A protein has these predicted regions:
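Short, flexible, mixed-charge acidic loops at enzyme active sites
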Residues: 39-45, 132-136
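Beta1/beta-strand and adjacent pyrophosphate-binding region of the FAD-binding site
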Residues: 1-12, 28
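Flavin (FAD/FMN) cofactor-binding and adjacent substrate-gating region
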Residues: 70, 95-168, 173-174, 179-182
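Gly/Ala-rich phosphate-binding loop of Rossmann-like dinucleotide-binding domains
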Residues: 17, 21, 164
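Dinucleotide-binding Rossmann-like beta1-alpha1 core, especially the glycine-rich loop
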Residues: 45-129
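Glycine-rich FAD pyrophosphate-binding loop
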Residues: 21-41
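Short beta-strand/turn micro-motifs composed of small residues
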Residues: 8, 31, 96-97
Length: 182
């Protein structure tokens, strides 16, 4: 009998299977389309970042960055000894007009408390860093260093996660859930 049955084998379902299997849980993932041609994750940019408003999301972003940087070690399997997600590190620039500036200043307090490495740039100083951006109407902007944020190939990341989850004992089956009961 399985400890956990996960409905859907996209990024979230597969990551859940990986982490639970790593803890020794018996996991089964039920996925209706194992080719993932109708899944949303292959179409996404695969961004990872720390610039959020809530502390929990900032900390999750920091965790994700550390995990992504360790993919070659953490997700290595016998079948895939050199996993990758084609990571590109390039900081995110978020810009705010006067109507959202105060909210962003409050968020920066959370960034500092979480040691997120976020830098505040006044709108009037934005062209010093990014001369190609028209800063009219920009009150403030935030930016992290180029090693803290970026993007990955989500399909490659999913494949590495799934391969490792399977090696750890997770079972992926094709199927569709029609109903749930106690």
């Amino acid at each position: 009998m399985d400890d956990v049955v996960i409905i859907g084998g996209g990024i979230i379902g597969t990551a859940t299977a990986y982490f639970l299997s790593k803890e020794g849980r018996k996991v089964k993932v039920i996925e209706r389309d194992p080719t993932y041609k109708t899944a949303s994750f292959p179409l996404s940019l695969g961004g990872f970042r720390r610039q959020f408003f809530q502390t929990e999301n900032i900390l999750l972003g920091k965790f994700a960055r550390e995990f992504i940087f360790q993919i070659p070690e953490l997700l290595k399997t016998e079948k895939n000894p050199k996993p990758t997600a084609s990571m590109v590190t390039n900081g995110y620039l978020l810009m705010f007009g006067p109507e959202h500036a105060e909210e962003q200043y409050k968020a920066l307090e959370n960034h500092k408390a979480c040691e997120a490495g976020t830098k505040n740039i006044k709108g009037s100083e934005l062209s010093n860093f990014f001369p190609y951006i028209n800063s009219d109407g920009i009150e403030t902007a935030t930016f992290t260093d180029n090693q803290s944020e970026g993007w990955i190939d989500p399909f490659m990341f999913h494949g590495a996660l799934k391969s490792k989850a399977i090696e750890l004992g997770a079972e992926f089956v094709k199927g569709e859930i029609k109903s749930l009961s106690e």
